[in-house]
Amino acid sequence: MIENLDKLTSEQLEEVKKQLTQINSSIEEQQAQPIAEFFNKHGWVKIDKIINKETADLFYLYCVLATERLNVLEQIEGVGNVNPHHYGMFDDPQATGDYSKYGDLIFDTLLYALNDKMNLYTGIDLIPTYSYHRLYTTGTELTKHSDRPSCEISTTLCLGFDNSNLDKSKYENYLWPLYVKEKDGTEIPINLEQGDMLIYKGCELEHWRDRLMGNNHAQVFLHYNDKKGPHNIKYDGRPFLGMIDDEKTTIY
């Protein structure tokens, strides 16, 4: 505890603030070191509660309302007549029928905001490429795949889900596992609670999900590149964050 804090000059207070910031930064780096070591050994690592419940609830509701908005727009304008770049789509081949959207500003903001933590958790100097969010629905299966270069270092963050259709006596703690295949062939199931995030090497590790049993499940994917790597695709070729993918200056 700092004594006589009320007697310090403004310059002294600023110096104290600076020193405390440096101490906190050093502590955070020390705590992140074993996380980065695990990530670089296995190609993935799980981070618990990267965002709190209140923030996750807000993002989950955002995904649900965006889905309902697109449903209403398609009823008014007709299927295929709504701009997917602005309002999202239901025809992503990876999850046909489920709502998906590329590069939404709110999630690109989250992508940007987590950049420093991602640097610590991976031990890599990263650059943000793009975000992508999706609201999965009952029966959706994510087939085994790896990702394109802009997804070199990826995250998938659980925003929330609705399992109210399930029999609680059988599925009281049901989570929808994500599987990753490590380089040695080991297949690892990873369960994410609301607010949890998985960091993984999207281009190297195959990943997939079995069929979803719950009503819905919202995830956001946050993608990064290694600044010193072969790709370094800033903003996925877009001029800036929050821009739609047909405004790319470079195609990857």
What is the predicted function of each stretch?
Residues 2-121:
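Non-heme Fe(II)/2-oxoglutarate
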Residues 26-27, 31-47, 125, 132, ...:
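Catalytic phosphate/metal-binding cores of nucleic-acid and nucleotide-processing enzymes, i.e., regions
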Residues 19, 43-44, 55-58, 161, ...:
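N-terminal secretory signal sequences
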Residues 46-49, 127-129, 199-200, 221:
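A structural signal for short, well-ordered beta-strand segments and their strand-loop junctions
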Residues 235-252:
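Acidic/histidine-enriched, glycine/proline-rich intrinsically disordered or flexible terminal extensions
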Residues 138-204, 208, 216-220, 226-240:
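Catalytic core of non-heme Fe(II) oxygenases with the double-stranded beta-helix
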Residues 89-95, 99-100, 109-172:
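Conserved double-stranded beta-helix
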